[in-house]
Swiss-Prot record:
PROSITE patterns: PIR_REPEAT_1, PIR_REPEAT_2. It is found in: Secreted, Cell wall. The record marks 72, 91, 114, 154 as: Covalent attachment to cell wall glycan. Component of the outer cell wall layer. May be involved in meiosis and sporulation. Residues 1-21 form the signal peptide. This is Cell wall protein PIR5. It comes from Saccharomyces cerevisiae (strain YJM789). The PIR1/2/3 repeats are required for the covalent linkage to the cell wall. Their number varies among different strains of S.cerevisiae. The lineage of its organism: Eukaryota, Fungi, Dikarya, Ascomycota, Saccharomycotina. Belongs to the PIR protein family. PIR1/2/3 repeats lie at residues 62-80, 81-99, 104-122, 144-162. It comes from the Eukaryota. Covalently linked to beta-1,3-glucan of the inner cell wall layer via an alkali-sensitive ester linkage between the gamma-carboxyl group of glutamic acids, arising from specific glutamines within the PIR1/2/3 repeats, and hydroxyl groups of glucoses of beta-1,3-glucan chains. Keywords: Cell wall, Cleavage on pair of basic residues, Repeat, Secreted, Signal.
Amino acid sequence: MHYKKAFLASLLSSIALTAYAPPEPWATLTPSSKMDGGTTEYRTSFGLAVIPFTVTESKVKRNVISQINDGQVQVTTQKLPHPVSQIGDGQIQVTTQKVPPVVSHIVSQIGDGQLQITTAKNVVTKSTIAVPSKTVTATATSTATAVSQIHDGQVQVTISSASSSSVLSKSKLEPTKKPNNEKVIKVQACKSSGTLAITLQEGVLIDSSGRIGSIVANRQFQFDGPPPQAGAIYAGGWSITKHGTLAIGDNDVFYQCLSGTFYNLYDQSIGGQCNPVHLQTVGLVDC
């Protein structure tokens, strides 16, 4: 009987070990390629501003990303450019607004981590916006709106429509100089309640609540955990390009896709209501 019990115990142990597969560390969920010259370390808190692609380089519309409580990132629709905000769950959102002559929209964050873009009229004395191969500098008063985050971590951006006054003179476009690590972020925006504030540590994005920035199964950009949401595609491999835009792997093109009164952010287009954008990194200042 003793040997029979020992045999059964050994058999059950073998079955358990065979069925067990150690989970893959989320930090290894990274793209196979990297951004050439990208910065993977930036421990000072910074925000994100949405720069939609336009017909000409001189027309720059910047919406700051906000984040709702669950970590999702969204962009709301408003008449002024807004920073990305974050709602409570970590989602990122961007509201829709009309862009003034020179405006920075900062993403805000709500309780769950989602990101949203609120409408703030904070004035910035000087704003320099880096875009591929070019740098747009404006010394006139600028409206800076930080992206917000809702409670779940989602990132949202409110809907904004660019006005004709958002055209910048081509004479102010200058080649971008190669930045060092301290100067990789060249744009500043006013920080307000709910503004998405993140740091970059060894290629991992972390929001002010300690949640991890990731591209989840449906390709949406949001903050969760740690660990990231189950089924996440990427949780590491983030960097800031030499132009000051956020990148995942070797890609710095994201998509804001309309969802009701706000946009969600994705690393790929998921349909006809999506538009390509750059996520400009911005320094956060109290105004």
